[in-house]
């Protein structure tokens, strides 16, 4: 077993602030492009398809590599991987802002995805190592403020910065925040697992995972254009299924697998991770709702982002409330309450058939419930996943949990956008938005069922 270095060092506020700042480089800054797509089209003189690739590729690459990065953090050092992630974000941000070349935009966004893959599992592992009991729950609350809170603020933040300062300032500010995070984390003792032998990295598993996820993403985003009977669609589907099947077989046989499926023998961990995937999938709500009010109601990006102010306020307030509910009620009840409230919010935002003034009111209230629900859910879910991971595997476990976050967001956005486009072309944008938002509500309902069935009433059983 790993000897926790927290015996010699205890986490403090300086380290925690550095961790939170590193986390928001992805969840706040990198995700802010979700509300500035038309501006990027003009700035880079390119089409919406290219911009959509740039917007989604960050979360996709984060999800593909986050598990591998979690394993590297366990082996070679969590502080080291965090610092590498922060430096990668600076590099990616520079590539994005130095020119108007679309290729550099995509490469920069790809590098930001790798940055997030390093930062997320490594920082969760640092919290596991250096914070104990209520201090750990407090640290996870602030970590959740950086992730869930950042995702809540990103739509309004991106629209506001792009309108008032110019979109490049999103990444200039991200570079400044990254430098501050590096300074605050500097001097923290390294923490790594001593029980994992430095075996050869699972390259085969990583390659298969990348092939599977890229194929699946293309099927979702381009499926309607390709046609389900086309040779390319069928080929991609076969590649996705084949690579997934081979990945499962190889990972179960590997001595040092990329994903340790033994972690999923714990129902609490499985429930937290699966529900986390689905509730991050409802990020598609922001894409659909923002696009609808801009195209259907004629709103600007700043006006569209302003509708979600209640979301960002509530998610920031309720994350600490979720922490207190975790301490008093255990993990299951807050996760169920949060998910249930979120579903109500989704239903309100989906009422696109209403007159404009009534729909705006429903949006404001719906986003309030949306943020309230996610805020209550965030800390209990994260704590459930981390608390049920063995210390020597916490980096990999955190990596899988955050892979669920990133891939849930990436595929939720892709699937919601695809449904919105298909139904809108068949009917109108009002119906298209409503059906796409119902899809997000459905993911919330499925998440509720998973929590109900898998997460125990008292989270006291650990691997």
Curated annotation (Swiss-Prot):
SUPFAM superfamilies found in the cross-reference section: MFS general substrate transporter
A Pfam family of this chain: MFS_1
CDD domains the UniProt entry points to: MFS_MMR_MDR_like (cd17321)
Segments forming a coiled coil: none
Gene3D superfamilies recorded: MFS general substrate transporter like domains, Multidrug resistance protein D
Keywords: Antibiotic resistance, Cell membrane, Membrane, Transmembrane, Transmembrane helix, Transport
Membrane topology: Multi-pass membrane protein
Transmembrane segments: 17-37, 53-73, 86-106, 107-127, 142-162, 165-185, 201-221, 230-250, 273-293, 299-319, 334-354, 357-377, 403-423, 435-455
InterPro entries the UniProt entry points to: MFS, MFS_dom, MFS_trans_sf
Keyword Transmembrane: yes
Any single Gene Ontology cellular-component annotation: plasma membrane
GO molecular function: transmembrane transporter activity
Database matches in PROSITE patterns: MFS
Record's note on what induces expression: Down-regulated by MgrA. Up-regulated by NorG.
BP term (GO), one: transmembrane transport
Localization: Cell membrane
PANTHER family registered for this protein in UniProt: MAJOR FACILITATOR SUPERFAMILY MULTIDRUG TRANSPORTER MFSC (PTHR42718:SF9)
Similarity comment: Belongs to the major facilitator superfamily. TCR/Tet family.
Function: Multidrug efflux pump that acts independently of NorA and is one of the factors that confers resistance against diverse quinolones and chemical compounds. Extrudes norfloxacin, ciprofloxacin, cetrimide, tetraphenylphosphonium ion (TPP), sparfloxacin, moxifloxacin and ethidium bromide. Also contributes to the efflux of tetracycline.
Protein name as catalogued: Quinolone resistance protein NorB
Originating species: Staphylococcus aureus (strain NCTC 8325 / PS 47)
